[in-house]
Amino acid sequence: MVHFTAEEKAIITSLWAKVNVEETGGEALGRLLVVYPWTQRFFDNFGNLSSASAIMGNPKVKAHGKKVLSSLGEAVTHMDDLKDAFAHLSELHCDRLHVDPENFRLLGNVLVIVLAHHFGREFTPQVQAAWKKLMSAVAIALGHKYH
């Protein structure tokens, strides 16, 4: 289990309060699909994913990105018990969707980049470290059912 300090929790929740879930989620998922094109196979019902511009403008990508990032809100509010908070999603992605758990880590890395882009100077190395720690812990929690 990952332990978050009071300072890390404050950093994460403070930034999360400013995140535009719809915009950031769509951008993060879109970037994942562009940068790691093999992840597109999990979204074959999303229509046109033939180019970066098609992916970034795809309404289904944006909608699912919002859904993914909304789920991340659970991580922010349940940092002390991520395994239980993500048990259902871990089971879904393992048993039904058969998503490679490495993709959770990749999405976390992409999200950190998107947050850095959106928040600029406010996204200090300390903020980056806290968010990287959270995203790593979320990836572990989502991959729990696989082990």
Curated annotation (Swiss-Prot):
Heme b binds at H64, H93. GO terms for molecular function: haptoglobin binding; heme binding; hemoglobin alpha binding; metal ion binding; organic acid binding; oxygen binding; oxygen carrier activity; peroxidase activity. Residues 3-147 form the Globin domain. The keyword Metal-binding applies. It comes from the Eukaryota. Red blood cells. InterPro entries: Globin, Globin-like_sf, Globin/Proto, Hemoglobin_b, Hemoglobin_oxygen_transport. PANTHER family: HEMOGLOBIN FAMILY MEMBER (PTHR11442), HEMOGLOBIN SUBUNIT EPSILON-2 (PTHR11442:SF35). Heterotetramer of two alpha chains and two gamma chains in fetal hemoglobin (Hb F). This is Hemoglobin subunit gamma. It comes from Cephalopachus bancanus. The lineage of its organism: Eukaryota, Metazoa, Chordata, Craniata, Vertebrata.
